[in-house]
Swiss-Prot record:
It comes from the Eukaryota. PROSITE patterns: ZN2_CY6_FUNGAL_2. It is found in: Nucleus. Residues 1-90, 164-208, 236-287, 323-384, 442-461, 598-617, 695-739 are annotated as: Disordered. This is Transcription activator of gluconeogenesis PADG_03802. One of its GO terms (biological process) is cellular response to starvation. The lineage of its organism: Eukaryota, Fungi, Dikarya, Ascomycota, Pezizomycotina. Transcription factor which regulates nonfermentable carbon utilization. Activator of gluconeogenetic genes. CDD domains: GAL4. Belongs to the ERT1/acuK family. Residues 97-125 bind DNA. Residues 69-83, 171-188, 442-451, 720-739 have a biased composition (Low complexity). GO terms for molecular function: DNA-binding transcription factor activity, RNA polymerase II-specific; RNA polymerase II transcription regulatory region sequence-specific DNA binding; zinc ion binding. The keyword Nucleus applies.
Length: 814
């Protein structure tokens, strides 16, 4: 009996004896094997000698004849296609297995991979370990597990899943499941069906979804009939990849809340079995904060290479979207918040008590109701940011949508359909709130109605609170269109020099000149190569940067000013005007500057030099000295040196010389004295403040508590002293007049001027310990016309590395 007969195959027909020598046949087998280098891993394609001692291959019988081999033909076809340059490229796996990683071979996404199956290593085929990045050295190895699509596969885990499935079949709990998913071959090697099932399903996914399914089935009887229909939130839309987060399966029938077919197939359980296995739907396992399912993180769609970075990014997004316990007043400003009602905020968002709590955190159908166009009736005004969450009603519920899990229809609508929050109707009248709440509540049984109602938490009424940000008066595009000429810094420096010579003594002028002379060569070196277009571009950069600082000044409650490198004021905050009395229009040069307070010994305008006086300048008509350097009609803003006393100005320019071309991110923090805005008409008298109370006002002198006699006209002697209100009046009946620091004329009725005796209230005293409100800020520096402050300033440079603007923040010393 030949070898063919022993193998059970028909004997080949007799043929002529072969004339091929053994040496030629061995050489031919060697060439055939060399053409198939990829088959060396398989024992079938490796040449094996037969018992006759001749070096013939597997495809040769004992008599030297060659029989056809199916495996050799398939291998030849594969090798032919592998050499084809037009063959489709193999898609690389996201993470190679350990064996392929060690061999530096291309692996696949399936586990076990085809190469390990061919080599018989399917039992030990698992994902390889990558080298940690530098920023992940401190992360534990357990946190670097790949996402859902890259779950680690192990044969032991697959065996445990099959044992659980077989036990459920024996108990009769899973009679409707597909038996083909549990079939294995005789060698205990997993089939492709087992690989796909074990790859996508994890024990945590099964546990979390079944737990939440039971929670929905327990409370489904208290659900409203209308529920939200959204394809992006339906688990059936994710059949290709079941999510690991708790699935909100919103079907049309609230009484039938079960898992979707895809989830039931992947989890391998039914709702009935999950209800018996998980008696506590809200146990500690469901609210494990370390599990991404609690926050609905879809880690696989975040395009992160590791789980550690995806969780960190997801938690930051969860905090940014405000999915936590956010007050109702802030909920409308959060991206992706659920249930922003276009009507009003109501206390009854999820119902009073556990009987009316919806199993879905966002109620019945807030999306369909809250974003309805105007004119349609709304029957549900529930909101995720509710008052009951404060009292602990929703403490056992998970937070709703976080990052990358909110449907696309939650995006902000157009401005015409944007809702506006008002809290006028229901918060003002509790009875209206209660009546509207009872009409919106679904009917419940008597047992739940007899439960005690928790106390209502009232929210202060916010009148006419509008949603949105204050619109700008201009856009950045207008800056590039309006700037046509460069700014004349040469004229600005000439005006600054003329002002310093008029105000300061020769010794102080020399100190300031030395400081400016130290940075003059640097200015010349950086500007000598600039042409007209560069100077225009420089001014556009300045205006664009100033446009950004306007929002900063409005949002910051600190007195702030922004000036050019010449010291000319370019922007000012409202708080600075309150503190110093300088109006914004005066500082920017839009109104005449009538200030006579230069920090001297009196308010007559005499400076520390003693001989020269400071001439107030008009923004439209320059003085004779300024006309020599400024073009006609150019507005002249106030210089920074006009706002500080002499010592503060000298100290500022000495620091500016060090910081202008020094540290680009450096800053200076020191103390100074700001000068109050005072005119010649700011005499001694009385004025009525915003609270209707009477207080004293004086020029640059000091306020005295002496008892002086006046004639009721309200005017002082002009010598820098202020007459107190408790003086004796003759009761002439004439109204007292006074021009305050802002130029407004205040008239005091004759009943006050004719009073025999009045004293200042404690709130109107000039003591620093009694400063409160805007009126208290105005009182600072009224004795000597100076406000002692601590201030911090820095220099911002442009693209040419030239000092562009100076930003200064002040805080009064009280």
């Amino acid at each position: 009996m030949t070898s063919s007969a022993r193998n059970g195959s028909p004997s080949p027909s007799p043929a002529l004896p072969s004339t091929t020598t053994p040496a030629e046949q061995e050489s031919r087998n060697t060439m055939t094997t060399a053409n198939n280098p990829g088959d060396w891993d398989s024992s079938e394609s490796r040449p094996q000698p037969l018992s006759n001692g001749k070096g013939v291959g597997n495809g040769m019988v004992a008599n030297g004849h060659q029989r056809p081999s199916t495996s050799s033909t398939a291998a030849s076809a594969n090798n032919a296609s592998a050499k084809d340059p037009l063959r489709p490229r193999r898609k690389k796996a996201k993470r190679a297995c350990f064996a392929c990683q060690r061999a530096h071979l291309t692996c696949g996404d399936e586990r076990p991979c085809q190469r390990c199956i061919k080599r018989g290593l399917q039992d030990t085929c698992h994902d390889g370990v990558r080298k940690k990045a530098k920023y992940l050295h401190d992360a534990p190895n357990e946190a670097l597990i790949p996402g859902i699509r890259g779950n680690l596969y192990s044969q032991a885990q697959a065996a445990r899943n099959k044992i659980n499935t077989n036990s459920q079949q024996r108990n009769g709990t899973n009679s409707n499941s597909d038996n083909n998913s549990t079939n294995t071959n005789s060698n205990n090697k997993p089939s492709h069906q087992d690989v796909s099932t074990n790859f996508f399903s994890t024990p945590s996914t099964n546990n979390y979804n079944t737990v939440y399914t039971q929670a929905k089935s327990r409370q489904s009887q208290h659900m409203p009939s209308r529920v939200m229909q959204d394809a992006t939130m339906n688990p059936s839309a994710f059949q290709a990849q079941p999510p690991a987060s708790p699935t909100f399966d919103l079907s049309s029938n609230p009484q039938n809340h079960t898992l979707s077919p895809s989830m039931a197939q992947n989890s391998g359980t039914t709702p009935s079995s999950s209800a018996s296995q998980n008696p506590d739907p809200y146990g500690p396992t469901f609210f494990d904060p370390s599990h991404p399912a609690l926050f609905n993180f879809d880690i696989a769609s975040m395009n992160f290479g590791n789980r550690y970075g995806a969780l960190e990014f997801g938690m930051l997004g969860h905090l940014a979207t405000g999915a936590g316990d956010t007050p109702p007043s802030d909920s409308a400003t959060r991206r992706g918040s659920i249930g922003r009602s276009s009507g009003t905020f109501t206390v009854q968002n999820f119902g009073e008590g556990s009987s009316n709590q919806s199993p879905f955190l966002f109620g019945g159908d807030p999306v369909l109701n809250d974003w309805n166009p105007a004119g349609q009736g709304q029957t549900n005004s529930r909101n995720i940011y509710n008052q009951n969450s404060v009292s602990g009603q929703m403490a056992d519920h998970p937070h709703a949508f976080a990052i990358e899990s909110a449907p696309m229809n939650f995006a902000s609508p157009s401005s015409t359909e944007s809702p506006q929050m008002t809290t006028v109707t229901q918060f003002d009248d509790p009875s209206v709130n209660f009546s509207s709440r009872t009409t919106l509540m679904p009917p419940t049984n008597t047992q739940h109605q007899q439960q005690p109602q928790p106390p209502r938490i009232s929210t202060p009424s916010l009148k006419n609170m509008q949603v949105g940000v204050k619109r700008r008066y201009r856009s950045p595009s207008s800056i590039y269109e309006s700037v046509k000429e460069p700014y004349s810094y040469t004229s600005g420096f000439h005006s600054l020099t003329a002002f310093i010579q008029r105000r300061f003594s020769p010794q102080k002028t020399l100190q300031i000149a030395k400081a400016l002379a130290s940075i003059r060569p640097s200015f010349i070196a950086t500007t000598k190569t600039l042409n007209q277009d560069d100077l225009i571009f420089m001014e556009k950069c300045f205006q664009r940067t100033l446009w950004e600082y306007e929002d900063f000044i409005d949002a910051c409650g600190t007195p702030t000013i922004v000036c050019r490198r010449t010291g000319e004021i370019a922007a000012v905050g409202k708080e600075f005007s309150i503190l110093t009395g300088w109006k914004k229009e005066v500082l920017l040069g839009k109104e005449p500057n009538l200030n006579v307070n230069t920090g001297g010994s009196s308010s007559s305008g005499v400076s520390s030099r003693g001989s020269s006086t400071y001439n107030s300048r008009n923004s439209a008509t320059m003085t004779v000295m300024d006309n020599q350097s400024l073009p006609t009609g150019r507005t002249q803003p106030v210089f920074l040196a006009e706002l500080l006393d002499d010592d503060s100005v000298i100290e500022f320019y000495e620091d500016f010389a060090k910081l202008a071309f020094g540290d680009s991110r450096g800053s200076v923090m020191t103390t100074c004295k700001l000068l109050k805005y005072k005119t010649k008409e700011d005499g001694v008298g009385l004025f009525r403040n915003s609270n209707g109370e009477v207080s004293a006002a004086g020029g640059g002198g000091t306020a005295a508590d002496d008892t002086d006699a006046n004639d009721g006209a309200g005017a002082g002697a002009g010598d820098g002293t202020t007459s107190a209100v408790n003086g004796v009046s003759n009761g002439s009946g004439n109204n007292a007049t006074n021009v305050n620091a802002n130029g407004n004329v205040n008239v005091i009725p004759n009943d006050l001027s004719g009073a025999s005796s009045m004293k200042l209230s404690p709130k109107q005293a000039w003591g620093k310990s009694r400063i409160a409100g805007e009126a208290g800020m105005n009182q600072l520096g009224f004795r000597d016309g100076k406000v002692e402050c601590s201030y911090c300033w820095t220099v911002k440079r442009d693209v040419f590395d030239i000092p562009m603007l100076i930003v200064m923040n002040f805080l009064p010393c009280i």
